[in-house]
Swiss-Prot record:
Its main location: plastid. The lineage of its organism: Eukaryota, Viridiplantae, Streptophyta, Embryophyta, Tracheophyta. This is NAD(P)H-quinone oxidoreductase subunit 5, chloroplastic. The chain crosses the membrane at residues 1-21, 31-51, 81-101, 117-137, 139-159, 177-197, 211-231, 250-270, 272-292, 319-339, 346-366, 388-408, 417-437, 534-554, 602-622. Keywords: Chloroplast, Membrane, NAD, NADP, Plastid, Plastoquinone, Quinone, Thylakoid, Translocase, Transmembrane, Transmembrane helix, Transport. GO terms for molecular function: NADH dehydrogenase (ubiquinone) activity; quinone binding. The gene is ndhF. InterPro entries: NADH_UbQ_OxRdtase_chlpt_su5_C, NADHpl_OxRdtase_5_subgr, ND/Mrp_TM, NU5C-like, Proton_antipo_N. It comes from the Eukaryota. It comes from Poa pratensis. It is a multi-pass membrane protein. Its EC number is 7.1.1.-. Belongs to the complex I subunit 5 family. NDH is composed of at least 16 different subunits, 5 of which are encoded in the nucleus.
Length: 702
């Protein structure tokens, strides 16, 4: 119970300082980063200690004390430590401390520095409390705290209307899921009379043999619990808040997508897995929602230009893989992918923050420009360390061995094919799409040449770079490919002449270039970030390279007794399950693994190759092949293919028209209903009342 409380002293101290000695606290604001990192480091030590206990003893520790007691009702508060909790504790604390270190450099010039550290520390505390909860009502309490912190951080730059709108959108969308979760909790309490996990699981085991509980009611309550996870983990159809959540600072985007907000939904399903697995209809629904989400997220990421939104849709798709794995009963594969994806995605988001940081001297603090991949390109020459780490993170998410995500995604794909060819086909095809859009992000950001000199760029179809979209870099004729630095007479970028000034949130970094003659001229150019931002990238790169090996089979030393190979993760997660197989099947399993791996890697390589053809250096080569171009132009199918490309691009760039549908049907529909209600209330109800009074008055006067 100590682990969730460790960050609280720092939060309280910062709040006390801001309230009583605000000037001194703000002047010494960067000092507060040290105790935040220190206390979270202590939490890591405790988490690792508990994990070692779980590996060696494989026992569950539970301590409860009474929270509210009367004659009929007792509400208890405690903690539950098991392998699932141990995994989440290590994941949250390691990613959390790296994000804190990164934030010290990223937010150093922001006036909301202290407020950001208060929010992010409380965010970590809430998530730690959630994963150590021992009952449903305790989970719901921390569930709401996690949501509150995420809303505060999404709308951190609240002076920007778009950030405030994104905060509101996340709040409203998650209200749907949270309300369903609350109803599900109350429903299961009414059915079972308990909120403790151990009691729920015991009763769930007796549902099938006894048939003493209404199956329709239990299915409905389980669906309501699942609805909470759908909203939190941005699953279809409650996924619309996640891309807009990128309006918050980049470090919190990394934390939300790796170890906190969206991971909470997956954790809830994993925690209640013994309950859901006893209801086959809900398991089918979980796998179906996961399949739809993983494919939808991949298609929506194909044509995005904002680097963070592209990664957000990638997260949505990967969470769909986890949902699919849980729905088909592949508990270990889902948690394995949760671990590997968390470190790879944290690396990618923090890397994107480094890219944005390097673009700001050129374009000013304007997310529409600093996060726009259309204006990037050629950054590998200016930020080589960021480029290297981002490339490894990209290849990991694409499923290239031996990187982390390869092992977990390959396991999910294999289990999907075994469960249903329908799920296997969609999951495998989406794996190819994942490789395509992830390598597209890398190529648009780091390959080629710097495109920031497009002074007349706009996001409309008439814009000069509108054609840099889904289908490759069709370069305008007026492009200077030898352009390196953008310079004006004042020594700053042309974009900086019209920088949107945001109160309290601006960061002005102008690079300085000294000539050999001693004269100092100011240029705007991309530059590598500081050590406090590079250090977390290198640590996350280490995890991305090696964390996948916990899922690789190893010899447990008992092959002579007919015991097959195990994995460290399976030994940790399911210590009580007999995982032994005949040694004669070991070769078959190895053969199947190699076959499945070749298939998944081939799909990833195809996706990488297509992305390189359309966005890489090879694009210009293929454009210059006159024979192929003339053949294509004369082909009667050209018009058909162009129309198909436009349809796919419009679908992807416009987010599948889902946001438009929600706006027109729900937002405008509810507003129309409220206006109708207002008219009925004031015009009819009040009119009748006032009319009766007026008639009575006239009669009385007469």
């Amino acid at each position: 119970w100590v682990i969730p409380l460790l960050p609280l002293p720092v939060i309280m101290s910062m709040g006390f300082g801001l309230f009583f000695i605000p000037t001194a606290t703000k002047n010494l604001r960067r000092i507060w980063a040290f105790p935040s990192v220190l206390f979270l480091s202590i939490a890591i030590v405790y988490s690792v200690h508990l994990s070692i206990q779980q590996i060696n003893g494989s026992s569950i520790y539970q301590y409860l004390w009474s929270w509210t007691v009367n004659n009929d009702f007792s509400l208890e508060f405690g903690y539950l430590i098991d392998p699932l909790t141990s995994i989440m504790l290590i994941l949250i604390t390691t990613v959390g401390i790296l994000v804190l270190i990164y934030s010290d450099g990223y937010m150093s010039h922001d006036e909301g520095y202290l407020r950001f550290f208060v929010y992010i520390s409380f965010f970590t505390t809430s998530m730690l409390g959630l994963v150590t909860s021992s009952n449903l009502i305790q989970i719901y309490f921390f569930w709401e705290l996690v949501g509150m912190c995420s809303y505060l951080l999404i709308g951190f730059w609240f002076t920007r209307p778009i950030a405030a709108s994104a905060c509101q959108k996340a709040f409203v969308t998650n209200r749907v899921g949270d309300f369903g979760l609350l109803l599900g909790i109350l429903g299961f309490f009414w059915i079972t009379g308990s909120l403790e996990f151990r009691d729920l699981f015991k009763i769930a085991n007796n549902w099938i043999p006894n048939n003493g509980i209404n199956s329709l009611l239990t299915t409905l309550c389980a669906f309501l619990l699942f609805l909470g996870a759908v909203a939190k983990s941005a699953q279809f159809p409650l996924h619309v808040w996640l891309p807009d959540a990128m309006e918050g600072p980049t470090p919190i985007s990394a934390l939300i997508h790796a170890a906190t907000m969206v991971a909470a939904g997956i954790f809830l399903l994993a925690r209640l897995f013994p309950l859901f697995i006893s209801i086959p209809l809900i398991m089918t629904l979980i796998s179906l929602v996961g399949t739809i989400t993983l494919f939808l997220g991949a298609t929506l990421a194909l044509a995005q230009r904002d680097i963070k939104r592209s990664l957000a849709y990638s997260t949505m798709s990967q969470l769909g893989y986890m949902m699919l794995a849980l729905g088909i009963g592949s508990y270990q594969a889902a948690l394995f992918h949760l671990i590997t994806h968390a470190y790879s995605k944290a690396l990618l988001f923090l890397g994107s923050g480094s890219v944005i940081h390097s673009m700001e001297p050129l374009v000013g603090y304007s997310p529409d420009k600093s996060q726009n991949m259309v204006l990037m390109g050629g950054l590998r020459k200016y930020i080589p360390i960021t480029r290297t780490t981002f490339l490894w993170g990209t290849l990991s998410l694409c499923g290239i061995p031996p990187l982390a995500c390869f092992w977990s995604k390959d396991e999910i794909l294999s289990n999907s094919w075994l469960y249903s060819p329908f799920f296997g086909i969609i999951a495998s095809f989406t794996a190819g799409l994942t490789a395509f859009y992830m390598f597209r992000i890398y190529l648009l950001s780091f390959d080629g040449y710097l495109r920031v000199h497009f002074q007349n760029y706009s996001t409309t179809k008439e814009g000069s770079l509108y054609s840099i979209s889904l289908w490759g870099k069709k370069i305008s004729k007026g492009v200077n490919r030898d352009f390196v630095l953008s310079r004006t007479k004042n020594g700053v970028s042309f974009f900086s002449q019209n920088r949107p000034q945001i109160q309290g949130n601006t960061r002005n970094r102008i690079g300085c270039f000294s000539t050999s003659f001693g004269a100092k001229n100011n240029f705007s150019y991309p530059h590598e970030t500081g050590n406090t931002m590079l250090f977390p990238l290198l640590i996350l790169l280490f995890f991305t390279l090696f964390i996948g090996f916990i899922g690789i089979s190893f010899d447990n030393g008992a092959m002579d007794n007919g015991i097959a190979e195990l994995t460290l993760l399976s030994k940790w997660l399911t210590p009580s399950i007999n995982l032994t197989q005949e040694s004669s099947n070991s070769f078959i399993n190895s053969y199947e693994f190699i076959t499945n791996a070749i298939s998944s890697v081939s799909l990833a390589i195809i996706g990488l190759f297509i992305a390189y053809i359309l966005y890489g250096s090879a694009y210009s080569f293929f454009q210059n092949l006159n024979f192929i171009n003339s053949f294509y132009k004369e082909s009667p199918k050209k018009y058909f293919f162009d129309q198909v490309k436009k349809k796919i691009y419009s679908w992807s760039y416009n987010r599948g028209y889902i946001d438009i549908f929600y706006t027109r049907v729900f937002t405008l529909g509810i507003r129309g209903l409220t206006e109708l209600t207002e008219f009925f209330d004031k015009g009819i109800i009040d009119g009748i009342t006032n009319g009766v009074g007026l008639v009575s008055f006239c009669i009385g006067e007469g």
